[in-house]
Amino acid sequence: GNLRFGEKLRVGELMYPMLMVSSNDSAEAVAQAYDPGRDKFIKEMNIWVNSIGAYRTYFKDASGLSPQNVSTAQDLSIIIQWVLKNDPEILDITLLKSKTIRTHTWTNPTHFLNLTSYIGGKNGYTPEADRTSVSLFKIGKYKRTYGVILLGSSQRDSDTLDLLDEALR
């Protein structure tokens, strides 16, 4: 997110770099802004994922950079299904090609933005996890939703399209 120390952005504004470009500093800024404090924010993140049934997900930090952050494809499926049902506006942010707020412009690197079937998702990368992604598509006459979740992929985009193609056979 290229945030500067002392810069003031609203939590809602921080969602754009966090979801569009996986901004670690934005995620940490949201955690720091939480009134009881960062540690309580992370604790609440863990309580929340457990409350929706994502029992094998654990957050050590807000940004996702710690190797102690863990999840599974099944848990990520539970989380994205919750988002789709309860807060689909989050996905709208992931569909933006770019967003400018004051002096910042963030450009979404997702290669699926030009596909009309793509309805949103989130990419990530750490050396331990390699490239990860959750990608959602609405396809077919009945606009059925398909999710492709990749963990540890070195070819994230082509793997996503290959798996989606396989699911549609």
Where are these regions (language model features)?
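Active-site-adjacent loops and short helices of periplasmic peptidoglycan-processing enzymes
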Residues: 1-74, 84
